[in-house]
Amino acid sequence: MHPRFQTAFAQLADNLQSALAPILADHHFPAMLTAEQVSTLKNTARLDEDALAFALLPLAAACARTDLSHFNVGAIARGVSGNWYFGANMEFLGATMQQTVHAEQSAISHAWLRGEKGLAAVTVNYTPCGHCRQFMNELNSGLDLRIHLPGRAPHTLRDYLPDAFGPKDLEIKTLLMDEQDHGFTLTGDTLTQAAITAANKSHMPYSHSPSGVALECKDGRIFTGSYAENAAFNPTLPPLQGALNLLSLNGYDYADIQRAILAEKGDAALIQWDATAATLKALGCHNIDRVLLG
């Protein structure tokens, strides 16, 4: 078990501990539960879906990287597939505050990058900030997405974001978590192809500036992130943050990164290179390359 989970795990009910122990035994537990695992945990712990999600929130919050605020927020995105995806906030010392990943963004991008097609609910241990409410409004679940908070009745995103502005106001039909493939040809080595594949998945209906990042760890594991734009612009999630989020959720540290590649168009309206390189260098990675999409 990764050390970050030990305190939260010890506070769980005995029957839930017994059911979770084999799942968490892997040091690189992927911070997600399959639909089958969720069903098993519900039956073993004798909890309904909402109660189980609340019980697991401390494990999600344990994934937080909060070197600046020391305020851990955890979230669980519940996919329409039945799979659950952990998320937690991430802060990057030496970078800028704008590079921060919020817990809801973490869980949602986690689900998206693993191929989830839509979300039914998000469970989070603190009220979503305005930034996250706007980020969630980009999803194909729209304002019907259920938000679950401890000690409160569940509400929809519509309740938390009245008079919402979103992609429909800009006549955008393809939403975040809808399947997208921009068709860029895969070239180069495995890591380069992974970055291009991530760029092909980008959600960028406002700038038309696709980008993807691939990070290779010292053990050969590769994590990718795709660019996810937002109708309000500022809640947009850069591709590097998506990749770093997956890397961290899987129990890796920034020191494990040995190489990084950004894929983007050289003549795009928005360029990720400077911000990507600066953040990676702040985290100790200097082997950074860029491939231009044709």
From Swiss-Prot:
InterPro entries: APOBEC/CMP_deaminase_Zn-bd, CMP_dCMP_dom, Cyd/dCyd_deaminase_Zn-bd, Cyt/Deoxycyt_deaminase, Cyt_deam_dimer, Cytidine_deaminase-like, Cytidine_deaminase_bacteria
Cofactor requirements of the protein: Zn(2+)
Keywords for the protein's UniProt record, in alphabetical order: Hydrolase, Metal-binding, Zinc
Cofactor note: Binds 1 zinc ion.
GO MF term (any one): cytidine deaminase activity
UniProt EC number: 3.5.4.5
Chain segments annotated as coiled-coil in the UniProt record: none
Cellular component terms per the entry's GO annotation: cytosol
Catalysis performed (reactions): cytidine + H2O + H(+) = uridine + NH4(+); 2'-deoxycytidine + H2O + H(+) = 2'-deoxyuridine + NH4(+)
PANTHER family according to UniProt: CYTIDINE DEAMINASE (PTHR11644:SF2)
Family the entry assigns: Belongs to the cytidine and deoxycytidylate deaminase family.
Name under which the protein is recorded: Cytidine deaminase
